Amino acid sequence: SKQDRENYQKYKKKIVDYYSKYEVSSGLYIDGNRTVNENIADLSAIQCISKILLNKKASDEEIRLAYQEYAKLWVEESTEEYQKLLLLVDTHAPNKYRVNAVLSSTDTFYRVYSLMPWDKMYISKEKRVKVW
């Protein structure tokens, strides 16, 4: 419906704005418009994983392990020049942000790691982006 489309566009803009604030290198930011579809996919994946773990009453330790394994998927070593090139051409956010930006928007992550406002990955609840 028209209302669904409007709601989706508002939601999508919030995700674009959220990712566009991440500075990857001095003066170089993620292009939230270019990466939005992949960002939605990453956010959806970790939110589904979190919900499944909560539904099966996984322990905090099991949930932390799942998040650690998710982070390991995106470990890479590359040059700064290569990262700058990817910012210009890739439809994915840089791997570091595929982990940090996603987990920083996941409420369960805050609970199992006891994150507080002074922690580097902390984002206030009203600024976190959600898919579901």
Show where each model-derived region lies.
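Zinc-dependent metallohydrolase catalytic domains
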Residues: S1-W132
